[in-house]
C-alpha cells in the first residue's frame, strides 16, 4: 500500500506531483485552476453546484441535466428553475437551451444565483454557450458547464466552443469519456475564484 508515501502527494492538499499535474491541466484547458477528481464527473458537477448554491437558492438549468445535478440540489436544498429544451422528433432527442429560453428564465427569476449548461448534451447538442455566459454574468449569476462529453472541445480544430473559452465560471470535464484517461477520472476547471455579487450595470 503506497497511498501515504510523501512522493505520491496528497489529493486533498497537493504540494508536489499532484499540484504540478493540476497546474499543467489548468494550462492545457485554459483555466485558472484545475482540480483532479477521482469520483467521476458526478463529483465535479456536485462540487460546482454545492459551491455556489445554498438552501433556497435558485439555479437555472435544462430539464435534461444529469442526475448528479439533481442529487446536488437535494443535498444543498437549492431550487431548480427548469428550461425545457425542444425535441427533435425525427431523431427522438432533446436539444440544447435556446438563448430566448434562458433570457426568459433570467428575467422571471432575477434572484437565481447560477445558470447551468450542458456542453454538449449526451447526444452532442450544444447551446449558444457564449451568449448564455454573457446573459448570466450580466445578471450577476454564475455560469456552470457540465462538459462530461466535451473534453475534446479543448483540443480539436473546428470544435464547438469550450466552457473556459466561453468564459464560464466553472466546468466539469469527464476525462475518461472523451479524454482517454482511466475510469472515474475527471477535472473541475475554474476560470476565476473571484466573482461580483451584483449585476453589472452600464454607466
Residue ranges and their predicted role:
Residues 2-43:
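Conserved N-terminal alpha-helix of the aminotransferase class I/II PLP-enzyme fold
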Residues 33-56, 71-72:
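Conserved beta-loop-alpha segment that forms the PLP phosphate-binding cup at the N-terminus of a helix
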Residues 56-117:
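PLP-dependent aminotransferase-like
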Residues 91-152:
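Active-site phosphate-binding strand-loop segment of PLP-dependent enzymes
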Residues 165, 186-192:
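Short beta-strand-to-turn element immediately C-terminal to the catalytic PLP-Schiff-base lysine
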Residues 194-203:
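Single conserved hydrophobic/aromatic residue that forms the stacking wall/gate
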Amino acid at each position: 500500500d503506497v497511498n501515504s508515501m510523501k512522493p505520491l502527494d496528497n489529493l486533498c492538499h497537493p504540494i508536489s506531483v499532484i499540484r504540478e499535474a493540476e497546474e499543467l491541466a489548468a494550462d492545457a484547458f485554459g483555466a485558472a485552476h484545475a482540480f483532479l477528481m477521482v469520483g467521476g464527473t458526478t463529483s465535479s458537477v456536485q462540487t460546482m453546484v454545492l459551491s455556489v448554491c445554498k438552501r433556497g437558492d435558485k439555479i437555472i438549468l435544462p430539464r435534461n441535466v444529469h442526475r448528479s445535478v439533481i442529487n446536488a440540489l437535494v443535498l444543498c436544498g437549492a431550487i431548480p428553475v427548469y428550461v425545457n429544451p425542444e425535441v427533435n422528433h425525427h431523431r427522438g432527442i432533446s436539444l440544447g437551451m435556446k438563448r430566448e429560453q434562458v433570457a426568459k428564465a433570467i428575467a422571471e427569476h432575477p434572484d437565481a444565483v447560477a445558470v447551468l449548461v450542458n456542453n454538449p448534451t449526451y447526444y452532442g447538442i450544444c447551446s449558444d454557450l457564449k451568449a448564455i455566459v454573457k446573459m448570466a454574468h450580466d445578471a450577476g449569476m454564475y455560469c456552470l458547464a457540465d462538459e462530461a462529453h466535451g473534453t475534446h472541445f479543448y483540443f480539436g480544430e473546428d470544435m464547438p466552443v469550450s466552457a473556459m473559452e466561453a468564459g464560464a465560471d466553472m466546468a466539469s470535464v469527464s476525462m475518461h469519456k472523451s479524454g482517454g484517461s482511466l475510469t472515474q477520472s475527471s477535472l473541475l476547471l475554474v476560470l476565476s475564484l473571484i466573482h461580483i455579487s451584483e449585476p453589472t450595470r452600464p454607466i
